[in-house]
């Protein structure tokens, strides 16, 4: 048995491990044109369109994402390659495929969890929530500058290093080319995060939609996961403004979640909102998170 295979089996049997993989999972080999990997046979996550597995290679855990070819095309691979060196974006290490699936081999961020589970049992303090949202805005700006829109910004698609409080954006299956001028009539993201103009009129513009989803993420960071707020709650007139946060924080959320898209906070003005006064406009690179993948896959 090879050392990477032994390491993966040891990880799977550790009841305290954060990998959330079933300890009874078997280990199989998977080969690409460049490398041999070892992968658990039971997923960490099962979704409607993809499954995510833990794998191992060259002494480091990695993620395997299987995306059904029947459900969606391989756009995610194209987008991740284009965003390869973009700060705050999950890194695609390698890609392969079989008859049924696109197989994305993706970096694993240690000590991390998605934001949905991060605030599952707790409401975040304003200082922490503000820094998370500011990071998110900077990352989305980086994606925007490369000519793309993520298309499905939500708690589940943001992972956070629980020690350093640094986030990364994942799951680019709904990402599309940026088009600021034309209305869009197809919604590829999550319905609960849809903007009101699409709900009412069946169209949206990409940047106002992005601002809306950022506002939704901000609202939900101040709530327990079971209390997550969505479009229908706002349209019903329920109060979505968190209590016990600053007036500038309340104003930011209100500005993002304005029903009239023409009065909503503009995408380009997000970063200069008074709520973020004093925060540095920088995103820490992957090597500072504890794993330098440039030296892992050779």
Swiss-Prot record:
Q: Which reaction does it catalyse?
A: L-seryl-[protein] + ATP = O-phospho-L-seryl-[protein] + ADP + H(+); L-threonyl-[protein] + ATP = O-phospho-L-threonyl-[protein] + ADP + H(+)
Q: Which GO terms describe its cellular component?
A: host cell cytoplasm; virion component
Going by the UniProt record, its keywords in alphabetical order are: ATP-binding, Host cytoplasm, Kinase, Late protein, Nucleotide-binding, Serine/threonine-protein kinase, Transferase, Virion
Matching InterPro entries: Kinase-like_dom_sf, PIM_Ser/Thr_kinase, Prot_kinase_dom, Ser/Thr_kinase_AS
Q: Tell me which Pfam families the record gives.
A: Pkinase (PF00069)
GO MF, one annotated term = ATP binding
Q: Does the keyword Metal-binding apply?
A: no
Q: What does this protein do?
A: Essential for viral replication. It may mediate the virus' progression through DNA replication.
Tell me what this protein is called: Serine/threonine-protein kinase 1
Q: Give the organism the record lists.
A: African swine fever virus (isolate Tick/South Africa/Pretoriuskop Pr4/1996)
**Lineage per the UniProt record:** Viruses, Varidnaviria, Bamfordvirae, Nucleocytoviricota, Pokkesviricetes
